[in-house]
């Protein structure tokens, strides 16, 4: 590792984990890849990875759930880093768990007919004939700058370009997102506007009710309470300063506006997982950072509060979404936006007082109209059938290249 990387690892208390990862990538992975080079591809095996081994969640989870619910003839394997897993991570019994960055993980990637990931793969053997790689990514609408549009390290860019060369299908949820991917993903292959697999659940009322009950039971939330979910994104500096919110005042505003009891759940971005215990939340606010599946939390929520993240998914509900951006100018300089933040249809506040005022003056009819117009301008493709479309891609690929699953 370079000196700067070592210093950052020590500062973030990840030195030993980073050192192990470096040893794996530079020494063990080449050896394991060589040993697995001539192993046969098993067309009915799908290997999933979510946020570099963070467990059962996001788009890969919902593709797997579709396979299970429809009893499709695939064997599924999940790459797991146990140190990164959180509450709600238990895999279904039909899915095999394999340690992330291990000989078994390289062997699985070498033999699986299908790879599914929602982030850049930081290691993978050379693809063989008959193998396909579906990159789902992990966003719905244009928000933050990503990939070539963002300020990224040379190491990341080098790895991202290598990853893009291996991708067979890159998924998109709308035409604006597709254009962004064409511009900045270092990818010349096929982009398929299937919709976002994780968003299918937002079109299923039974699953929404089931998820709300699951969250309420786990956190002992009264079933009649309404839920505000706070989903801030990460900052490059990993500071917690922008997350200081007047929770008590916000709850008072919600109760005045909607005449109901409210519970607040705060969930940090996965990049901030190691800082979750430093939040110092009031006793009446639930720390939901260790709940792995954001979609389940979104299903349970009645209002979302965010800054620069997760706004697209939740707005599919046409439920209220508020943006709290106390460091807006700093964030513009640090990360920037794919489109001007003012073009979003959601109320934006820079202070706690402004946020409380926006809640009290919220107009549902005007909000719904703005959000629907935003959908049209983005060319939204979400209709609750993204997972079905992904499985058709797999079936068509395997029929064309391999003569089917069997």
Locations of regions flagged by a protein language model:
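Nucleotide-activated donor-dependent transferases that construct or modify glycoconjugates
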Residues: 29-53, 233
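C-terminal amphipathic helix plus adjacent low-complexity
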Residues: 1-3, 8, 36, 207, ...
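A donor-sugar binding/catalytic signature common to diverse glycosyltransferases
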Residues: 115-137, 141-144, 291-334
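Catalytic binding pocket for nucleotide-activated donors in carbohydrate/polymer assembly enzymes
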Residues: 308-378
